[in-house]
Amino acid sequence: DHTALSPRDELVLTDQQMPGSPLGIPSGATGPIQPNYWRAVEYSAQHMAPSPAGANNFRCQPRAGQNPVVLIPGTATNAYSSWSMMSEELTRRGYCTYTFNLNGVPHSSFISLTGDMRESAKGLGAFITMVLTRTHTDKVDLVGWSQGAGPLPNQYLKFENGASRVDHFIGLVPSNHGTTAYGLNLFLNSTTSKLGAHFDDSMALLNGMSAPQQLQGSDFNKTLYDTPVTQPGVKYTIITSTHDHVVVPYTN
Protein backbone atom coordinates (compact mmCIF):
# COMPACT_ATOMS: atom_id res chain seq x y z
CA ASP A 1 0.00 0.00 0.00
CA HIS A 2 1.96 2.99 -1.28
CA THR A 3 -0.54 5.40 0.29
CA ALA A 4 0.97 4.59 3.71
CA LEU A 5 4.36 5.96 2.66
CA SER A 6 5.79 9.41 2.16
CA PRO A 7 7.67 9.86 -1.13
CA ARG A 8 10.94 9.78 0.81
CA ASP A 9 10.12 6.52 2.61
CA GLU A 10 8.85 4.92 -0.57
CA LEU A 11 12.09 5.85 -2.32
CA VAL A 12 14.15 4.34 0.53
CA LEU A 13 12.23 1.06 0.46
CA THR A 14 12.17 0.86 -3.33
CA ASP A 15 15.92 1.43 -3.45
CA GLN A 16 16.58 -1.36 -0.92
CA GLN A 17 13.87 -3.85 -1.94
CA MET A 18 14.88 -7.31 -3.10
CA PRO A 19 13.46 -9.67 -5.75
CA GLY A 20 10.10 -10.98 -4.56
CA SER A 21 9.85 -8.45 -1.72
CA PRO A 22 8.36 -5.18 -3.00
CA LEU A 23 8.87 -2.42 -0.44
CA GLY A 24 10.59 -5.08 1.68
CA ILE A 25 7.48 -7.23 2.15
CA PRO A 26 7.95 -10.91 1.18
CA SER A 27 5.37 -11.65 -1.53
CA GLY A 28 5.81 -15.41 -1.80
CA ALA A 29 3.53 -18.04 -0.33
CA THR A 30 3.51 -18.60 3.41
CA GLY A 31 6.18 -21.15 4.20
CA PRO A 32 5.89 -23.99 6.70
CA ILE A 33 7.07 -23.62 10.27
CA GLN A 34 10.62 -24.96 10.40
CA PRO A 35 12.10 -26.84 13.38
CA ASN A 36 15.54 -25.30 12.94
CA TYR A 37 17.29 -22.41 11.25
CA TRP A 38 19.15 -24.34 8.54
CA ARG A 39 16.00 -25.97 7.22
CA ALA A 40 14.46 -22.52 7.00
CA VAL A 41 17.52 -21.27 5.09
CA GLU A 42 17.26 -24.17 2.64
CA TYR A 43 13.55 -23.55 2.09
CA SER A 44 14.03 -19.83 1.50
CA ALA A 45 16.77 -20.54 -1.04
CA GLN A 46 14.44 -22.86 -2.96
CA HIS A 47 11.31 -20.67 -2.91
CA MET A 48 10.92 -17.05 -3.94
CA ALA A 49 10.54 -14.76 -0.93
CA PRO A 50 8.45 -17.00 1.34
CA SER A 51 6.63 -15.29 4.17
CA PRO A 52 6.70 -16.56 7.76
CA ALA A 53 3.28 -17.62 8.99
CA GLY A 54 1.21 -14.78 10.39
CA ALA A 55 3.53 -11.97 9.34
CA ASN A 56 2.62 -8.76 7.52
CA ASN A 57 -1.14 -8.89 7.93
CA PHE A 58 -1.88 -5.18 7.77
CA ARG A 59 -5.51 -5.80 8.68
CA CYS A 60 -4.35 -7.02 12.10
CA GLN A 61 -5.29 -4.65 14.91
CA PRO A 62 -3.15 -4.85 18.07
CA ARG A 63 -5.00 -5.71 21.26
CA ALA A 64 -5.27 -3.15 24.03
CA GLY A 65 -1.86 -2.73 25.64
CA GLN A 66 0.01 -4.32 22.74
CA ASN A 67 2.14 -2.78 20.00
CA PRO A 68 2.82 -4.13 16.53
CA VAL A 69 5.95 -6.29 16.65
CA VAL A 70 8.62 -5.74 14.00
CA LEU A 71 10.91 -8.76 13.62
CA ILE A 72 14.38 -7.83 12.34
CA PRO A 73 16.43 -10.52 10.56
CA GLY A 74 20.14 -11.06 11.03
CA THR A 75 23.00 -10.50 8.60
CA ALA A 76 22.64 -12.40 5.31
CA THR A 77 19.41 -14.04 6.48
CA ASN A 78 15.84 -13.17 5.54
CA ALA A 79 12.38 -12.73 7.00
CA TYR A 80 11.47 -16.40 6.64
CA SER A 81 14.74 -18.05 7.65
CA SER A 82 14.91 -15.85 10.74
CA TRP A 83 11.28 -15.96 11.88
CA SER A 84 9.46 -18.98 10.41
CA MET A 85 8.73 -20.27 13.91
CA MET A 86 8.57 -17.17 16.10
CA SER A 87 6.27 -15.20 13.80
CA GLU A 88 3.65 -17.94 13.93
CA GLU A 89 4.01 -18.30 17.69
CA LEU A 90 3.61 -14.57 18.33
CA THR A 91 0.64 -14.37 15.97
CA ARG A 92 -0.99 -17.33 17.69
CA ARG A 93 -0.65 -15.41 20.96
CA GLY A 94 -2.47 -12.44 19.50
CA TYR A 95 0.37 -10.18 18.38
CA CYS A 96 0.50 -8.39 15.02
CA THR A 97 3.90 -9.22 13.51
CA TYR A 98 5.79 -7.65 10.63
CA THR A 99 9.12 -8.44 9.00
CA PHE A 100 11.04 -7.62 5.85
CA ASN A 101 13.79 -8.33 3.33
CA LEU A 102 15.93 -5.27 2.52
CA ASN A 103 19.40 -4.14 1.44
CA GLY A 104 20.77 -7.54 0.50
CA VAL A 105 23.11 -9.13 -2.02
CA PRO A 106 22.27 -7.84 -5.52
CA HIS A 107 19.77 -10.03 -7.38
CA SER A 108 19.31 -12.39 -4.43
CA SER A 109 15.83 -12.94 -3.02
CA PHE A 110 17.00 -14.51 0.24
CA ILE A 111 20.31 -12.96 1.39
CA SER A 112 19.27 -9.71 3.02
CA LEU A 113 20.79 -7.09 5.34
CA THR A 114 24.30 -7.35 3.94
CA GLY A 115 24.57 -3.69 2.95
CA ASP A 116 25.72 -0.62 4.84
CA MET A 117 23.89 -0.64 8.17
CA ARG A 118 23.46 3.12 8.07
CA GLU A 119 21.31 2.64 4.98
CA SER A 120 19.56 -0.40 6.45
CA ALA A 121 18.60 1.74 9.45
CA LYS A 122 16.86 4.15 7.08
CA GLY A 123 15.06 1.18 5.51
CA LEU A 124 14.03 -0.09 8.93
CA GLY A 125 12.70 3.36 9.74
CA ALA A 126 10.65 3.55 6.54
CA PHE A 127 9.25 0.06 7.17
CA ILE A 128 8.31 0.98 10.75
CA THR A 129 6.59 4.13 9.50
CA MET A 130 4.54 2.00 7.10
CA VAL A 131 3.57 -0.39 9.92
CA LEU A 132 2.55 2.45 12.24
CA THR A 133 0.53 4.20 9.55
CA ARG A 134 -1.33 1.12 8.40
CA THR A 135 -2.05 -0.17 11.91
CA HIS A 136 -2.98 3.30 13.24
CA THR A 137 -0.58 2.97 16.16
CA ASP A 138 2.09 5.22 17.66
CA LYS A 139 4.84 2.78 18.64
CA VAL A 140 6.19 -0.65 17.79
CA ASP A 141 8.12 -3.27 19.72
CA LEU A 142 11.29 -4.55 18.07
CA VAL A 143 12.58 -8.12 18.24
CA GLY A 144 15.78 -8.93 16.40
CA TRP A 145 18.75 -11.25 16.34
CA SER A 146 22.45 -10.80 15.51
CA GLN A 147 22.77 -7.59 13.45
CA GLY A 148 19.02 -7.17 13.85
CA ALA A 149 19.42 -7.28 17.63
CA GLY A 150 22.23 -4.78 17.96
CA PRO A 151 23.89 -2.40 15.53
CA LEU A 152 21.05 -2.05 13.03
CA PRO A 153 18.24 -1.16 15.45
CA ASN A 154 20.64 0.83 17.63
CA GLN A 155 21.65 2.88 14.59
CA TYR A 156 17.96 3.51 13.92
CA LEU A 157 17.18 4.41 17.52
CA LYS A 158 20.18 6.70 17.97
CA PHE A 159 20.54 8.42 14.60
CA GLU A 160 17.20 8.08 12.78
CA ASN A 161 14.87 9.44 15.49
CA GLY A 162 13.70 5.89 16.14
CA ALA A 163 13.36 6.21 19.90
CA SER A 164 10.14 8.17 19.51
CA ARG A 165 8.57 5.21 17.70
CA VAL A 166 9.80 2.24 19.74
CA ASP A 167 8.44 1.10 23.11
CA HIS A 168 10.39 -2.11 23.81
CA PHE A 169 13.48 -3.45 22.04
CA ILE A 170 14.35 -7.13 22.56
CA GLY A 171 17.72 -8.26 21.21
CA LEU A 172 18.64 -11.93 20.82
CA VAL A 173 22.42 -12.60 20.76
CA PRO A 174 23.20 -9.13 19.37
CA SER A 175 26.42 -8.18 17.62
CA ASN A 176 26.79 -5.06 19.73
CA HIS A 177 30.37 -3.72 19.62
CA GLY A 178 31.18 -6.18 16.82
CA THR A 179 33.14 -9.42 16.80
CA THR A 180 36.85 -10.12 16.96
CA ALA A 181 36.26 -13.04 14.57
CA TYR A 182 38.91 -14.86 16.62
CA GLY A 183 41.50 -12.20 15.84
CA LEU A 184 40.69 -11.64 12.16
CA ASN A 185 39.44 -8.17 13.02
CA LEU A 186 43.08 -7.11 13.46
CA PHE A 187 43.76 -7.94 9.80
CA LEU A 188 40.39 -7.09 8.21
CA ASN A 189 39.65 -3.82 9.99
CA SER A 190 40.29 -0.85 7.71
CA THR A 191 41.19 1.30 10.71
CA THR A 192 44.17 -0.93 11.57
CA SER A 193 45.46 -2.52 8.35
CA LYS A 194 45.86 -1.98 4.61
CA LEU A 195 44.35 -5.41 4.04
CA GLY A 196 41.25 -4.15 5.83
CA ALA A 197 40.87 -1.33 3.33
CA HIS A 198 40.91 -3.87 0.48
CA PHE A 199 38.39 -5.98 2.40
CA ASP A 200 36.09 -2.96 2.65
CA ASP A 201 36.40 -2.30 -1.07
CA SER A 202 35.60 -5.93 -1.91
CA MET A 203 32.59 -6.00 0.40
CA ALA A 204 31.29 -2.72 -1.01
CA LEU A 205 31.24 -4.25 -4.51
CA LEU A 206 28.99 -7.04 -3.18
CA ASN A 207 26.81 -4.69 -1.11
CA GLY A 208 28.37 -6.41 1.88
CA MET A 209 29.52 -3.52 4.07
CA SER A 210 27.68 -4.83 7.13
CA ALA A 211 30.45 -7.45 7.47
CA PRO A 212 33.39 -5.08 8.03
CA GLN A 213 31.13 -2.73 9.97
CA GLN A 214 30.51 -5.54 12.48
CA LEU A 215 34.19 -6.08 13.22
CA GLN A 216 35.24 -4.95 16.68
CA GLY A 217 36.94 -1.57 16.43
CA SER A 218 35.37 -0.56 13.11
CA ASP A 219 34.65 3.10 12.42
CA PHE A 220 30.95 2.23 12.37
CA ASN A 221 31.08 0.71 15.85
CA LYS A 222 33.13 3.59 17.22
CA THR A 223 30.60 6.12 15.96
CA LEU A 224 27.67 4.12 17.32
CA TYR A 225 29.00 2.88 20.65
CA ASP A 226 31.72 5.28 21.85
CA THR A 227 28.99 7.53 23.23
CA PRO A 228 25.92 6.27 25.13
CA VAL A 229 23.74 4.17 22.84
CA THR A 230 20.60 3.51 24.88
CA GLN A 231 17.85 6.04 24.32
CA PRO A 232 15.48 7.58 26.89
CA GLY A 233 11.98 6.14 26.82
CA VAL A 234 12.93 2.82 25.22
CA LYS A 235 12.85 -0.40 27.28
CA TYR A 236 15.74 -2.75 26.45
CA THR A 237 16.00 -6.52 26.92
CA ILE A 238 19.16 -8.30 25.75
CA ILE A 239 19.42 -12.11 25.71
CA THR A 240 22.77 -13.68 24.88
CA SER A 241 24.58 -17.01 25.17
CA THR A 242 28.00 -18.10 26.36
CA HIS A 243 27.94 -20.55 23.43
CA ASP A 244 27.91 -17.84 20.75
CA HIS A 245 30.84 -18.54 18.41
CA VAL A 246 30.07 -15.78 15.89
CA VAL A 247 29.92 -12.74 18.14
CA VAL A 248 33.13 -13.16 20.12
CA PRO A 249 33.62 -12.44 22.87
CA TYR A 250 29.97 -13.15 23.60
CA THR A 251 29.93 -10.22 26.03
CA ASN A 252 30.04 -7.87 23.05
Q: Predicted segment positions?
A:
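Flexible, membrane-associating and regulatory peripheral segments of lipid-active enzymes
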Residues: D1-E89
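Alpha/beta-hydrolase active-site loop signature
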Residues: A76, G104-P106, N176
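C-terminal catalytic-base region of ester-bond hydrolases, centering on the histidine
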Residues: V229-N252
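Conserved alpha/beta-hydrolase
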Residues: E88-S108
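Serine-dependent carboxylesterase/thioesterase catalytic core
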Residues: P73, S120-L224
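Catalytic nucleophile-loop/oxyanion-hole region of alpha/beta-hydrolase
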Residues: H107-G123
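Extracellular/periplasmic catalytic domains that process cell-envelope and extracellular macromolecules
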Residues: Q61-G65, L90-R92, R134-T135, V143, ...
